[in-house]
């Protein structure tokens, strides 16, 4: 039932994070500093220039083509007599250091009294890549660096004996720096440029390059191509107040909470260009070196600069709740009535997302042995058409704590043995967008010329047909499992099997509609997927004196099946995805020449 609590937003799972709160007995300060050195566990073994040149000649010979390098040129690679014209460059060592450094400083402060508690944490993290630093142009730093600073404060205020106020605020700054070419894509050049292609620089200081590899000099791309600097800022705040209503009836309480998230980002780019050249060298049969240098491109001493605002997101959430928990002898009953409203606004047009839900949750436990939990959620999305914005999401679960039965009292090694099962319905509107249910129009229709200058004017055109009967994606999920704790809770095991059917997935409607209609057909809610699997974990935690140790293992099995994606007619049955795994790769098997 946990996913059903989130209605139209719960089908893909929910991650709940509980942060630390303050203590009520004095002040506690913790300071942790971690310093790490990242080293290359294993580096690739690249062919040197002489080996590469021989391999290239062999490959050309196999295709019946003339050799690229003659004997004199091969000898020049071997001896290194002409390091600029017949170079031997180890691009890996020229661009990477042997180590990278990581710093992490974390300070936390916790304290307070019975009336007021606080918890504050400051977390600073910095990671410097093994890629080498630009030492030639001090106007920008291309060393790939990740820097993060997070400050969090949680407050608990006991306003009265029955009123508790909680507040939290988080500020986070993240900065990413690196070469404009890309910290990851530069490795494509390091791996792809042969050691014999060109030198790092020629004697005149111009970077090496060629008509084949262009400006793809890894050292130049790392140090002299400009840099990028991405800065992201996040501000999260939440406030809640809980009122104990035991004066009305024992176990009754009300709570209201509001939260705001503000996320923004900036992308700064510095552009720089450089010249590159190639000597186009050759060695004649008598050993004479002949060069015909060619220089390409231009040097740009003035840095180009862009600083666009990259992204913005504003999220707000309001929740009101009345809950009841009480014990009558062997009977424990509980319930909650919750209203939730969420709004997410992103930069751009038609990028807002709004959801609201009303849900009822009820629980019953008898003698701490048998429990039943039921949820009913009425959830809506602004993406859906008027009159059909809301759907119902029920769920139910049951558990039997076998270890609390009388016949288990003599089984002393077992501390907990629980069997549980659940079934529920949840939804997902994250793949929807605004006005899918409306006919769309564009400006790409037949046009005309008008006016003194006979300027062209485009006409209107019909876009995709609307999605008829648009609904949110549905997930029906059933689980069955057990939990075991034994030997004073040192041994713990969990096994859970699950089955899930995803339906009403948006897929193309064109495949089931004849092209004679003459217009682009929109999507339809006809996709169906199935999932089934098993999760299991086993762990042992114990101590010998003051030495604590633990060992564990986990296993997951997942089988997926495409039931329907509205696929078009295929000439051969093996081309259909139906019945195969979701995301399965398809291709031809190479069985050789015959």
Residue ranges and their predicted role:
Residues 103, 154-163, 168-173, 179, ...:
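Extracellular/periplasmic, surface-exposed regions of secreted and cell-surface proteins
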Residues 21-133, 307, 324:
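Residues embedded in well-ordered regular secondary structure
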Residues 7-11, 45, 411-415:
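Short, glycine-/polar-rich solvent-exposed loops and beta-turns at beta-strand/coil boundaries
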Residues 30-83, 181-182, 436, 527, ...:
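Conserved small-residue
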Residues 67-89, 104, 185-216:
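Acidic, glycine-rich flexible loop segments
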Residues 11, 93-176, 329:
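Transmembrane beta-barrel wall of Gram-negative outer-membrane proteins
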Residues 2-9, 39-43, 469:
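N-terminal plug
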Residues 1-30:
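A beta-strand signature from Gram-negative outer-membrane beta-barrel systems
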């Amino acid at each position: 039932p946990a996913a059903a609590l989130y209605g139209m937003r719960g089908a893909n799972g929910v991650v709940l994070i509980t942060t630390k709160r303050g203590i009520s007995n004095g002040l506690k300060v913790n300071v942790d500093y971690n310093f790490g050195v990242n080293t290359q566990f294993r580096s690739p073994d690249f062919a040197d220039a002489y080996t590469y040149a021989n391999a290239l000649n062999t490959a050309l010979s196999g295709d019946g083509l003339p050799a690229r390098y003659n004997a004199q040129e091969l000898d020049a690679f071997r001896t290194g007599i002409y390091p600029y014209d017949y170079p031997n460059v180890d691009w890996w060592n020229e661009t990477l250091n042997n180590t990278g450094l990581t710093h992490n400083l974390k300070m936390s402060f916790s304290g307070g009294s019975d009336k007021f508690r606080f918890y504050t944490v400051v977390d600073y993290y910095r990671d410097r890549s093994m890629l080498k630093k630009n030492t030639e142009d001090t106007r920008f730093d291309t060393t790939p660096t990740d820097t993060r600073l997070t400050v969090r404060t949680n407050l608990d205020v006991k306003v009265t004996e029955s009123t508790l106020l909680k507040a939290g605020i988080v500020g986070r700054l993240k900065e990413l720096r690196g070469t404009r070419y890309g910290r990851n894509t530069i490795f494509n050049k390091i791996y792809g440029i042969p050691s014999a292609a060109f030198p790092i620089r020629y004697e005149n200081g111009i970077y090496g390059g060629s008509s084949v590899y262009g400006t793809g000099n890894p050292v130049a791309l790392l140090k002299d191509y400009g840099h990028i600097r991405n800065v992201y800022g996040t501000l999260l705040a939440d406030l809640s107040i809980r009122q104990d209503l035991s004066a009305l009836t024992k176990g009754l309480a009300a709570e209201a909470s509001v939260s705001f998230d503000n996320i923004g980002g900036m992308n700064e780019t510095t552009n720089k260009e450089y010249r590159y050249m190639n000597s186009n060298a050759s060695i004649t049969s008598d050993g004479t070196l002949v060069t015909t240098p060619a220089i390409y491109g231009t040097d740009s001493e003035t840095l180009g600069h862009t600083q666009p605002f990259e992204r913005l997101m504003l999220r707000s959430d309001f929740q009101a709740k009345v809950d009841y928990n009480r014990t009558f002898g062997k009977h424990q009953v509980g319930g909650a009535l919750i209203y939730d409203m969420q709004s997410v606004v992103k930069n751009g047009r038609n990028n807002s997302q709004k959801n609201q839900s009303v849900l009822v949750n009820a629980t019953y436990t008898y003698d701490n042995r048998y429990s039943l939990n039921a949820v009913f959620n009425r959830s809506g999305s602004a993406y859906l058409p008027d009159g059909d914005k809301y759907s119902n999401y029920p769920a139910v679960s049951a558990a039997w704590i076998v270890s609390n039965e009388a016949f288990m009292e003599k089984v002393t090694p077992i501390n907990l043995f629980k069997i549980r099962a659940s079934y529920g319905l949840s939804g997902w509107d994250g793949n929807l967008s605004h006005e899918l249910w409306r006919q769309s129009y564009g400006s790409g229709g037949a046009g005309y010329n008008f006016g003194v200058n006979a300027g062209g004017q485009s006409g209107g055109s019909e876009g995709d047909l609307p999605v008829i009967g648009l609904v949110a994606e549905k997930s029906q999920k059933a689980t069955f499992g057990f939990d075991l704790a034994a030997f004073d809770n040192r041994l713990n095991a969990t096994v859970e099997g699950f089955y899930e059917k995803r339906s009403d997935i948006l897929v193309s409607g064109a495949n089931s509609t004849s092209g004679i209609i003459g217009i682009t057909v929109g999507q339809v809610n006809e996709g169906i997927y199935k999932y089934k699997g098993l999760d299991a974990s086993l762990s042992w935690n114990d101590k010998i004196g003051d030495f604590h140790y633990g060992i564990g293992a986990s296993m997951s099995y997942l089988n997926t099946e495409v039931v329907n994606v509205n696929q078009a007619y295929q000439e051969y049955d093996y081309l259909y995805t139906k019945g195969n795994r979701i995301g399965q790769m398809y291709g031809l098997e190479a069985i050789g020449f015959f």
